[in-house]
Amino acid sequence: HAGQAGEVATDALRYVCDCNHYDAVKMAIFENLVIEGLGGAEIIVEKKGKYLDVVVKQTRWETVFWDGHSRRKDFKDANHMGHATWMYVEDIEVLYGEKAGKVAEDSLAGVGVGGLAWGSYDDRPTVGQWLDYKHKRVLVVDMYCKYKGRWTRSLFCNGGDLIEPMVSEYTDEFGEPVCPIELASVYVDRENARYGLVRGMIGPQDEIN
């Protein structure tokens, strides 16, 4: 029976990897590790009709953020991490409901919770930018944070929460909430900055310049 259970588990993992084109995802993450020094993925569950699918999504290095005090290469000492993504207001309503859509719409109308905002024409989040008036988009932050020792999730934009903050839906084998984002880095310097192999190829004089 133990052997059969092992085969079932192996088949299940192989199925998840095949559905997510895992080899391609791994290569993309590896490229981020080598060049930018940081790579990872978010392992989540998505409902598709009456089925639940395990989805492995690469976290783009330019959109992800983490606890600046984290020193471990696997980020296991981080107290928060997440990613910031530009989203159209209409897509927010489809994904998170009418109330969330209203919060995003209010952001563009100037009813936000604060912070600076400019009309952005860039698809990559920039410090200080929360709103893209031209394309009716808002910067959506999906953040997992340890609160009283438990991982919680918040999803918000400049206008406020898009969903109610909650304990993470994902748990470990002991039933404890976990963060579904897995990150890794190649090197960590004394200032906790992450970097990859490419930085070591830069000559001393070029680095000074």
PLM features: residue spans?
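Extended alpha-helical, oligomerization-prone segments that build pores/tubes and scaffolds
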Residues: 1-209
